[in-house]
């Protein structure tokens, strides 16, 4: 195995020693892992090239029963530039080439006919042109305080992830009153698709706070073209 980590020391110490020896003998530059990771997007194609060379070696040499490989280029470039951009199309083409090379390796190894290929992603992308900042509204209502980019005091806060946000109310004594107030205010924000209370969490596959203490007190969903930001800076909620 080779772990999916940046740090060179961990990358090598947690890898199978005999595999590292084989890769070095083949001239695959595993010593570049951390250097290329630190380069950000500029190092993504190099990393995918190296990971594919490693996969080819494992397939042709060891004929594994199962092999998983993480290609990073498409995710990184679409995060940086959005969908339907020249960079995104280039990244998709690059990853297509890497998948083709892996398939060709199974043919070379004589296991193609008995191999199932699964190409999957952990998430998709939606292009947005506006950001909703629920923590700005919470700050304006006196429910949190910030110092520069940092939130330093909070009675409530929003944890955001793309087109969704989870609002946690930490003021237990006034939780119901605050939840009702925030529900009404969040509904009025342009770009807000839904403000969901715990009684309706089943509709989005979310456990209630009673079922899981890590669950939020309100769940927010953005309309197409909008994304959530966790920033509490500024005066504009959108």
Regions found by a protein language model. Give the residues of each.
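Short secondary-structure boundary/capping segments
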Residues: 2-4, 83-86, 132-138, 234-237
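Structural recognition of the beta-strand scaffold that forms the well-ordered cores
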Residues: 66-70, 117-119, 166-168, 219-221
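Active-site-proximal segments of metal-dependent phosphoesterases and phosphodiesterases across multiple
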Residues: 81-96
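His/Asp/Glu-rich, glycine-adjacent segments
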Residues: 1-82, 187, 194, 229
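Extracytoplasmic/secreted cell-surface and envelope-processing proteins
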Residues: 77-79, 127-130, 176-178, 229-231
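Active-site neighborhoods of enzymes that stabilize oxyanions during catalysis
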Residues: 152-238
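Metal-dependent active-site segment of extracytoplasmic phospho-/sulfohydrolases and closely related
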Residues: 94-138
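Extracellular/periplasmic catalytic domains that process cell-envelope and extracellular macromolecules
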Residues: 59-63, 110-113, 158-161, 211-214
